[in-house]
């Protein structure tokens, strides 16, 4: 029986391809071919980087939530770089640190542009399918996600676009190549709308504020070109936006609550103690719940938020007053301390108001560096910063959990702030890990972690180039600043100002300049004036902390490392001698590590790093390595070990992998009938190199070595 199959070729009638140039390279968008069931989808091709961007939204709002449920996922597939995952299952697992940080970078500029009263689940997914090291997958994903949302039927006030800005040899470079990034003094990820800056994420090598603003302006110009491209696509194939059911309180009910309880809330808020404020709000909310039994828990949370927000914002904009009584540019009380923990390598505690962070520094060998099994530019990290935020730091009674995205993001910000001032590996061949334990949190814990890291590193004796401090700046707006709306920035925001304000602008740096920036906003963007003012306020606050708080406590790194820290030494050996130091199957290097209680790391270029708790052990390992890589010299005396006995003499190992023969006639200064009468296998003996033949065989003499040693002792005795 013959079967007939209809031959049908899918031609994808909705397929469209759009092309432009982005920072000098081709940027291609393909739609209508993949992921037909998503609300919006686009394949982005930038150079040879390919990122598939999708956005989906639930049909109904999620019940019982008082927030907009947005999730942003940046998925790194190692096949994109032609690699197989190193896990046991050879499969990608949970998102790595780099993927989480990329997700946060995309989340922050798109989130403020969604309707705040929408409760439908929205999921944005960016899948890296091909990785070109010269074309950022992160920037491609950000622009692709913006396009996918803008052309979808999901309500959104975008688009935005992003660009990467570098500073190479003093020149601003847009979307620099991998080689340019390695030599850049600036790593700035910028997102913006047509008129405003929406997100800033930066690491910098002590770049001044003026140069930073030039980089921001240059990046914004390129972003405007990308926005024009995105808008042209949306105009052609964009879908009409869906309607949604907004979550809102009854206006009459809210007016009644304001009339009856706003003055009580003002009295409760007027304190610099977070616990007192929270406790004072409880009876007020209980009273509101009793007056309006129809309100749900989510409704009450929203009312509490609105009441506190109204008080905080009104006080700031109308009276220039802060809830804790500080001036607009006044920093909370500060304290710093080092050397708190006796057995750790370094420790520092930084306190700012009710925010307190204890940072511990640990030094390790190069083998302790973190291997990065992801698509980042860095194969491993020698400086690691971990940030822990336990529940007790905010007075919550629950069990701790593993680090989430917030902890990873805050840890990376403090890590990025310190990297520019770390010594080069050749100067200080240690792996460095700092752990910041948040003991109490009332805002700006990430910046307290930067300050705590500086204290801990200097306490550990790490020769950092300059101390680093961090501080944040907040913002309150009333209307659009571009069109006459009022706005005010304030220095060193605490938790309640962060929660109810419009911006958390965090800046870390030294006296010379900026080393890290992270900007979070809740409005649709910032003007240049706001960004410039925030940078200047953070500069002044940073200098105050460095000069008045950190310097009096510890002005420079300690001259010596902790006695509990491993002692690290480095040396160079010829590349062709690496195999001799390692030995067959690693035998030689393993024996040295065991005999001298040390760690030995050898790099491909011949750099050798030796670490040991006891300095003498490390020096003995260095001496042994030198004997391995150096050619034996005639007349040199070595302390060797007898390895074999023959009728005609004994073989002696003078260095791992190097043996020579002591003829029976050279064993002693008298006639020897039997070799075993003088030495046994395993005996340590002194020998002198007397000859090396053309085949590299080494002839040794115990008799000559003993005579030379006796002569030196006699000469020393006469002196």
What kind of region is each of these model predictions?
Residues 2-58, 62, 243-377, 566-580, ...:
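Extended amphipathic alpha-helical scaffolds
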Residues 2-245:
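Long, basic N-terminal domains or extensions that often function
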Residues 38-122, 128-135, 194, 201, ...:
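Glycine-rich, flexible beta-strand/loop modules in the N-terminal catalytic cores of phosphate-handling
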Residues 40-43, 135-153, 338-361, 442-462, ...:
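Conserved phosphate/anionic-ligand binding catalytic regions in large, soluble enzymes, centered on
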Residues 108-116, 151, 340, 365-366, ...:
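Conserved helix-loop functional segments at active or binding sites
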Residues 116-122, 157-159, 226-244, 275-276, ...:
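Flexible, glycine/charged-enriched surface loops at secondary-structure junctions
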Residues 153-268, 457-559:
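Mobile "lid/hinge" segments at catalytic clefts and subdomain interfaces of large enzymes
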Residues 564-568, 575-719:
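Single-stranded RNA-binding regions, centering on S1/OB-family and related RNA-binding modules
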């Amino acid at each position: 029986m013959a079967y007939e199959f209809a031959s049908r070729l899918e031609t994808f009638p909705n397929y469209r391809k759009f092309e432009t140039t982005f920072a000098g390279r081709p940027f291609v968008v393909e739609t209508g071919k993949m992921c037909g069931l998503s609300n919006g989808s686009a394949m982005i091709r930038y150079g040879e980087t390919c990122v598939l961007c999708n956005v989906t939204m639930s049909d109904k709002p999620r019940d019982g939530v008082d927030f907009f449920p947005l999730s942003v996922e940046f998925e790194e597939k190692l096949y994109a770089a032609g690699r197989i995952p190193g896990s046991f299952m050879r499969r990608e697992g949970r998102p790595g640190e780099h993927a989480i940080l990329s997700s946060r970078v995309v989340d922050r500029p798109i989130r403020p542009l969604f309707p705040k009263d929408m409760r439908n689940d929205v999921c944005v997914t960016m899948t890296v399918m091909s990785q070109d090291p010269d074309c950022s997958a992160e920037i491609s994903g950000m622009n692709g996600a913006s396009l996918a949302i803008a052309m979808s039927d999901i309500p959104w006030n975008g688009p935005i676009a992003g660009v990467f800005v570098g500073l190479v040899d003093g020149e601003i470079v847009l979307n620099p190549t991998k080689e340019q990034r390695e030599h850049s003094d600036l790593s700035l990820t910028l997102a913006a709308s047509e008129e405003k800056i929406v997100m800033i994420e930066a690491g910098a090598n002590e770049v001044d504020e003026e140069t930073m603003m030039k980089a921001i302006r240059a990046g914004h110009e390129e972003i405007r070109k990308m926005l024009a491209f995105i808008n042209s696509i949306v105009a052609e194939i964009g879908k009409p936006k869906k309607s949604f059911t907004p979550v809102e309180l009854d206006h009459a009910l809210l007016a009644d609550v304001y009339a009856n309880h706003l003055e009580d809330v003002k009295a409760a808020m007027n304190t610099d103690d977070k616990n007192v404020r929270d406790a004072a709000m409880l009876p007020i909310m209980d009273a509101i719940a009793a007056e309006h039994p129809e309100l749900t828990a989510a409704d009450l949370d929203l009312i509490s938020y609105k009441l506190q927000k109204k008080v905080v914002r009104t006080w700031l904009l109308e009276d220039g007053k802060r809830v804790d009584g500080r001036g607009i540019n006044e920093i909370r009380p500060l304290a710093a301390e080092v050397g708190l923990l006796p057995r750790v390598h370094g420790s520092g505690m930084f306190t700012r108001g009710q925010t307190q962070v204890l940072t511990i520094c640990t030094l390790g060998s190069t083998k302790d560096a973190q291997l990065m099994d992801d698509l980042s530019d860095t194969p491993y990290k020698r400086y690691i910063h971990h940030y822990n935020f336990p529940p007790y730091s905010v007075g919550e009674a629950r069990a701790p959990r593993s680090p989430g995205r917030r902890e990873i993001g805050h840890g990376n910000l403090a890590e990025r702030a310190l990297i520019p001032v770390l010594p080069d590996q050749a100067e200080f061949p240690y792996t460095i890990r700092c752990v910041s334990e948040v003991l109490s949190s009332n805002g700006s814990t990430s910046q307290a972690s930067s300050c705590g890291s500086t204290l801990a590193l200097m306490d550990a004796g790490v020769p950092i180039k300059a101390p680093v401090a961090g501080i944040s700046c907040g913002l309150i707006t009333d209307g659009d600043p571009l069109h006459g709306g009022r706005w005010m920035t304030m220095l060193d925001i605490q938790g309640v100002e962060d929660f109810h304000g419009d911006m958390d602008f965090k800046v870390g740096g030294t006296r010379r300049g900026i080393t890290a920036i992270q900007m979070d906003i809740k409005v649709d963007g910032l003007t240049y004036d706001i960004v410039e003012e925030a940078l200047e306020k953070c500069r002044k606050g940073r200098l105050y902390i460095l000069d008045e708080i950190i310097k009096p406590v510890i002005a420079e790194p300690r001259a010596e490392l902790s006695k509990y820290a491993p002692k690290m030494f480095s040396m160079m050996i010829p590349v062709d001698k690496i195999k001799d130091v390692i030995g067959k199957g690693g035998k030689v290097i393993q024996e040295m590590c065991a005999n001298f209680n040390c760690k030995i790391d050898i790099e491909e270029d011949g750099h050798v790093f030796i670490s040991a708790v006891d300095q003498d052990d490390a020096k003995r390992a260095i001496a042994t390595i030198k004997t391995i890589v150096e050619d034996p010299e005639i007349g040199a005396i070595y302390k060797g070990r007898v390895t074999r006995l023959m009728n005609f003499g004994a073989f002696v190992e003078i260095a791992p992998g190097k043996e020579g023969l002591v003829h029976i006639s050279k064993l002693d200064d008298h006639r020897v009938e039997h070799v075993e009468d003088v030495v046994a296998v395993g005996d340590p003996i002194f020998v002198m190199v007397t000859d090396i033949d053309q085949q590299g065989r080494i002839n040794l003499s115990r008799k000559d070595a003993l005579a030379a040693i006796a002569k030196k002792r006699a000469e020393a005795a006469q002196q």
